[in-house]
């Protein structure tokens, strides 16, 4: 596919790196992630453990990933689930990735999307214990809501004694939402 070849030429991704695919809604970010996943499976299936995290995604998208990548380790929460379910599945996926790295594996985690994950943490924090008493920052984001998504994204690393964790995530911009802009800027 040309898309993955262009990405490889313009912005090559090395083991242990983290990267963002930033664009407006409905511009093909999820399709690009699917193409990248297919390319990784085709070229590095034996060397790299591929994981996919789909947060607050349409059920059709989840099904498309599962059909296109049989046997892939896919963690997904659909958009008809509660915010707490989105946050749980993300934490489960990142902890699994960390354990694989500790076991010496090279892991590539594709995440769609870090914006929706941050929204889920914001929703979970504002509706959880003491949520109504929590202070809000720019864009109506609850203080501390972006801490966990930032930590999850920062988990990417290349270790000497074990494996590596590479994370490539999507981020939304130009949504006319101050919250999404605050998430992206953070």
Give a label for each model feature.
Residues 1-21, 27:
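P-loop NTP-binding catalytic core
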Residues 27-29, 34-186:
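P-loop NTPase catalytic core
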């Amino acid at each position: 596919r040309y898309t993955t070849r262009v990405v490889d030429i313009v912005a090559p991704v090395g083991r242990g790196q983290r990267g963002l695919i930033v664009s407006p809604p409905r511009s093909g970010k999820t399709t690009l992630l699917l193409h990248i996943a297919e390319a990784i499976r085709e070229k590095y299936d034996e060397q790299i453990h591929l994981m996919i995290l789909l947060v607050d995604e349409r059920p059709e998208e989840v099904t498309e990933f599962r059909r296109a990548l049989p046997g892939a380790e896919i963690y997904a929460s659909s958009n008809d689930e509660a915010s707490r379910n989105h946050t749980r599945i993300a934490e489960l996926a990142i902890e699994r990735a960390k354990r694989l790295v500790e076991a010496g594996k090279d892991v590539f985690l594709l995440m769609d999307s870090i914006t929706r994950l941050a929204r889920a943490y914001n929703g979970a924090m504002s509706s959880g214990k003491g949520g109504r008493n929590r202070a809000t920052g720019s864009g109506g984001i609850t203080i501390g809501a972006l801490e966990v998504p930032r930590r999850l994204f920062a988990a990417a690393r290349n270790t000497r004694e074990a494996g590596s964790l590479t994370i490539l995530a999507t981020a939304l911009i130009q949504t006319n939402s101050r919250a999404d802009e605050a998430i992206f800027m953070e």
